[in-house]
């Protein structure tokens, strides 16, 4: 109940995920399924997705799948438009040091997307 209440009260949701077998982690899918039952707290909620992976493709397949899930009946999150707003960090081992993102170009890109998401949330 607390999780559902937290999502209900949030101005927006940022989902950061890995990619497992070309899809979203099962625990994330389960959480979204749970949020879509009873009081549907995701409907109309601004959502942005991001992912990090050591592979060349980043989390592109999981990102595509999560967008489908978030658009489904009972969920219907208000997704930040994808054009230029998808944070898909590939080759993570080259871009992180001691758990911190250190690649300057990626940092600048992420900062820009976060700023656009804040504006997206504020516009309602």
Locate the predicted segments by residue.
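A short, well-ordered alpha-helical element
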Residues: 1-5, 106-109
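Helix-loop-strand module that forms the ligand-binding subsite of alpha/beta enzymes
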Residues: 2-76
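Glycine-rich phosphate/pyrophosphate-binding loop and the adjoining helix
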Residues: 77-124
